[in-house]
């Protein structure tokens, strides 16, 4: 669910996975693995960085707001 939500918000912002990775300062492979469900429980730090890069709260990112 988290991966799908990240992808949804990323596409709304018209960001590529690579661009989001750079904005969040996390590896590109982490973004792809989280979005596809390979990483099911990313670290709180990674989720916080992704949420900040997408301009949403962690709660909204997790719940899909």
List each model region and its residues.
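Short basic helix-loop element that most often maps to the first helix and adjoining turn
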Residues: 4-23
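Conserved hydrophobic/aromatic packing and binding residues within compact polymer-binding modules
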Residues: 6, 20, 31-34, 61
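DNA major-groove recognition helix of helix-turn-helix/homeodomain DNA-binding modules
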Residues: 45-60
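Recognition helix of helix-turn-helix/homeodomain-like DNA-binding domains
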Residues: 26-41
